[in-house]
């Protein structure tokens, strides 16, 4: 693992040792159907994930979902986002603004796939070395879905999972949490302490928080979910996933969600998901503006 993922692994270990966090998280998993009973059905269910699915999106048209990605999409964790509105409480004023994190995450996945396909077609241009350092060091592979490189596969999974830590009213909830960060608790810790524990393990300093390098709470919760023991057991059953400890992959996915590199020279890869002009922004700007009553 590269340095960012190693730092996340330290934080994940600390979270797993917090019995209250683990208990509350697993209770939340149980409440949405991501429980032991669901996990017990997955070995048999894997046989169904042997071909591409297609979902029609009103923004991007037909989105093809590859088997291992459909496995994530069909999980109760991802399906929960059908009930989380993208724009919080805006729909109360603009009735057409009722789109959800579910369709947004699908859109981000689609845009990332398009960007990767473009990179693949123009790989020679993007692999030109500048000052003896390769700008984009992605091991490109044929277009066939089963041959995606590890980096591409993890980026696509990060695209699907990047918003699973959002609370019920999206960013509105975050403002509520921020205003009560010393009183509301996550496991044994207040939200303030939870953020501080990440800051310490991820080697951020106070100035990082003040200058905006501090990670949003929704992203920290996403990382906590992805690196949890139960999610690791679920991910280990992923079609095509080797039967080994998935924590290195999950830490790399989490690193991409946070906008950091998973390889020393992968400067461009994380920016496809979290950069000045990234797949996340491309989708939500188009999707939010598409609703005629929700135009600023």
Predicted regions and their residues:
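Sequence-structural signature of the catalytic-core scaffold of metal-dependent phosphohydrolases
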Residues: 2-85, 89-157, 165-296
């Amino acid at each position: 693992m590269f340095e960012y993922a190693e730092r996340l692994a330290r934080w994940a270990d600390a979270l797993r040792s917090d019995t209250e966090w683990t208990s509350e998280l697993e209770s939340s998993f149980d409440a949405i159907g991501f429980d032991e009973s669901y996990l017990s059905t997955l070995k048999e269910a894997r046989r169904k994930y042997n071909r591409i699915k297609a979902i029609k999106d009103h923004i991007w048209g037909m989105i093809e979902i590859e088997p291992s990605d459909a496995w994530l999409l069909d999980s109760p964790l991802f399906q929960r986002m059908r009930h989380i509105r993208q724009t919080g409480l805006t729909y109360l004023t603009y009735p057409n603004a009722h789109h959800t994190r579910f369709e947004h995450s699908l859109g981000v996945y689609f845009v990332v796939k398009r960007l990767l396909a473009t990179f693949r077609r123009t790989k020679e241009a993007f692999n030109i070395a500048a000052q003896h350092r390769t700008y984009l060091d992605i091991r490109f592979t044929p277009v066939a879905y089963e041959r995606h490189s590890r980096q591409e596969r993890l980026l696509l999974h990060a695209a699907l999972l990047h918003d699973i830590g959002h609370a019920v009213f999206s960013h509105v909830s975050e403002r509520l949490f921020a205003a009560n960060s010393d009183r509301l608790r996550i496991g044994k810790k207040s939200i303030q302490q939870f953020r501080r524990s990440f800051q310490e393990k991820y080697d951020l300093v106070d100035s990082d928080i003040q200058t905006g390098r501090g990670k949003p709470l929704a992203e920290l919760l996403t990382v906590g979910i992805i690196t949890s023991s139960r999610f690791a057991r679920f991910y280990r059953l992923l079609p095509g996933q080797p039967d080994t400890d998935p924590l290195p992959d999950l830490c790399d996915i989490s690193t991409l969600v946070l906008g950091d590199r998973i390889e020393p020279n992968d400067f461009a890869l994380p920016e496809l998901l979290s950069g000045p002009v990234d797949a996340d922004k491309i989708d939500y700007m188009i999707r939010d503006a598409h609703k005629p009553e929700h135009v600023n």
